[in-house]
Structure formats: C-alpha cells, structure tokens
Regions:
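Conserved loop-alpha-helix segment in the C-terminal half of the alpha/beta-hydrolase fold
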Residues: 217-258
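Active-site loop/oxyanion-hole signature of alpha/beta-hydrolase fold enzymes
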Residues: 45, 55-98, 102, 272
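Short glycine-enriched nucleophile-adjacent loop
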Residues: 104-115, 121
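Alpha/beta-hydrolase fold catalytic core
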Residues: 1-24, 45-48, 67-68, 75, ...
Length: 284
C-alpha cells in the first residue's frame, strides 16, 4: 500500500513490508520504487522491515520541489539524502540505506550527515565520485560506448527514446517481466511533468558526494555489476569508492554478468550479498 510522507515542499511516496530492523530502498534516476519488486520481498522474508521509496519527482512522489541548493531545476544527491533521512526519522530509525545509482551517492551523504540514523549503507552500481570520460574505454568497450552515447543523447535532445535504448544496454539479460516493466515505466514518464523531473537529475554532481567519502563512519558495501555500461571498469569504480573511505569501512562485491540494474537482473545474488551484510550491521 502506498503511503505518503509530507516533506519540505512536497510528498515522498513509499511502501513498507515486513518486520524487523529498518532497511530503506532507494532507486536510481528515471525509475520508480518498483525497481525493487524482486529484492524487497526477499529482504522482508529474511526478517527486515523494508521501506521502498520513490525519489522526489519520480513514481508517485510530488513534483516541482525546490532543491536544497536553491535551484528549481535540479534534483541532486543532497536532495535525495534529505528525503531519505526524513523517511528514516518518520519510520523510526536507525536504518540501513540500500541506494542504487544516484541513490548510492545520496546514501553516502545521508550517512555522513546523520550517523545516528544510518547504521550502514549498501550502494548498488553507485554514482558516488567524480566521473570523467574514459576515452580508451569509449573506443574499445562497446557496452560503455553505447550506454554513454544514449545518456548524452538524452541530455542533449531530452527524448525518452534515448533512455529506453540506454536501458536495453543496462540490462544485459532481462528479467521475465522486462517488457511489461518498461511499458509501465514509459507510461509513468508520459505523465505531465514526469520527464522534466527526471531530467532534473542531470544537474546532480557526483563530485560533491565524492568529497564526503573520507567522512563515512558506518560500514559500507559497494556492489558492482561487471557489465554495467556506466563505467568502463565497474570493479575499479567500486574499488576507488572504497579507497576514498576510511580504512576498513568499505567492501566491494561484484555480480558477474550484471548490468546497471543488478537488483532486478540478479535479485537472488544481490539478496544474498545484502542479507549477509545486514546480518552483521542492521540494528533495531
């Protein structure tokens, strides 16, 4: 059942399942909380209270909110972090945040800003540090070239076709409900204002998150898909994130053959990694 949390200037949509220590699931750009349709029930069955939330401007969450930066045309890592912390306070933290892509970076910021509320973070294929074009990778690695080209096209031409061509690359193998899920996502992005909200995430700057990595004090698990088209070398990206954290804080795991959406493509493997981590670090 969808619930709504009133936050500064709008509402965040979320649903809760299960009982136990609190786990917050936060999806990536251009998606909605149903991205965790496979992972959330597995975590609930393992004994956790799981809240899946829509990013601001996405899914059923409200549109048109002012960024914490003061801009009205941006959805940034700090914005998402603020919403996640508001949800944790509302539900009664502390919580472990599981953040995908942009939400991985947001989880980092939330953990630094409120260490009393965030007991640990799991970052799935995260954008948590400054990105730059890997020219050699662009020339040599087809998945990286195809993924990046479509993302550039999306920002330049603002047409959803580029996004769905990117998603085709980002899921190297498709879940059984892929076509139905993409149809539902396309319908959501056709709603008035939704595509414009999605494009606001292009104003986010992972570099502002990367500068906070040395301040992380809670355990962190970084999970990378080896075929993620967003990175020329996904394992190296994960290693670099952990290297920027204090020694002993972070751990990297990889999902062989996984794309950018490992939680939907390989939910059993991701669930095993996350549940093992939660058993050590989640607390009521």
């Amino acid at each position: 059942m969808t619930e709504f949390l009133g936050v500064d200037g709008g509402t965040i949509a979320y649903d809760v399942t299960g009982d136990g220590p609190l786990v917050i699931l936060s999806h990536g750009i251009g998606d909605h909380r149903q991205a965790y349709r496979f992972l959330a029930p597995k975590l609930a069955q393992a004994g956790y209270r799981v809240a899946s939330a829509d990013l601001r401007g996405h899914g059923e969450s409200s549109m048109g909110r002012m960024s914490v930066t003061g801009a009205d045309d941006a959805i940034t890592h700090p914005d998402i972090a603020a919403d996640l912390l508001a949800l944790i306070r509302h539900l009664g933290g502390p919580a472990v945040i599981v953040g995908h892509s942009i939400s991985g970076g947001a989880a980092t910021i939330a953990a630094v800003q409120a260490p009393d509320l965030v007991s640990a973070v799991v970052e799935l294929n995260p954008f948590t540090k400054k990105q730059s074009l890997n020219l050699g990778g662009f020339l040599r690695i087809r998945r990286y070239r195809r993924g990046l080209s479509n993302l550039i096209g999306l920002q330049l031409f603002k047409r959803p076709g580029f996004w769905f061509r990117y998603l085709d690359v980002a899921y190297p193998t498709k879940p059984a409900d892929y076509d139905a899920y993409m149809a539902a996502l396309a319908a959501k992005l056709r709603e008035p204002g939704r595509m414009a909200e999605f494009l606001k995430t292009g104003k986010s700057k992972p570099a502002e998150t990367g500068t906070r990595l040395p301040e992380v004090s809670c355990p962190a698990l970084i999970v990378m898909g080896t075929l993620d088209p967003d990175f020329a070398d996904p394992r190296a990206e994960g290693d670099a994130i952990v290297a920027a954290m204090p020694a002993g804080i972070g751990t990297v795991a990889v999902v062989s053959g996984g794309g950018h959406y490992i939680h939907a493509q390989s939910p059993d493997e991701v669930a095993a990694l996350v549940i093992g981590f939660l058993k050590e670090h989640a607390r009521a």
